[in-house]
Amino acid sequence: MKLSLRRKFKGPKYTIGDLSIDGTFFCNTIEDVIRELPDSCPNTSRWIPCKCKEKVYARTAIPTGTYKLTLEYSPKFKRKMPYLHGVPHFLGILIHWGNTEDDSGGCIIVGENSVKGKVINSRATFKKLYALLEKEKDITIEIY
């Protein structure tokens, strides 16, 4: 299964995107603001939090790229969640529910972008996405 996240609107504090599954539109997303980051981080590959000056903790969208996605247990959510592997500068990046970039903390929030600067119906959208993901073994997400 291939997920694609096309970032289409870059606001002053948030980024809105379209998430597609195998080429078909599925939902909208909201993330933090995009910041220019170095190509790699010497810390996160060793599971040490990023200290790069360009990154603002919990206020920066993840870099563009293609990432492996698996369902992993999240202590915060107390359940399995879609987890992105190998994201430079970031640890613990998930796809989850929320409404604004304040709920993101660097993660990807799914929902419907029918209100400026937020997504709605996020929990219902997440449940539908999760039901599709849990049937798959080989999942990637391309972010551009």
List the model feature ranges, each with a label:
Residues M1-I139, Y144:
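Cell wall/extracellular polymer interaction/catalysis modules
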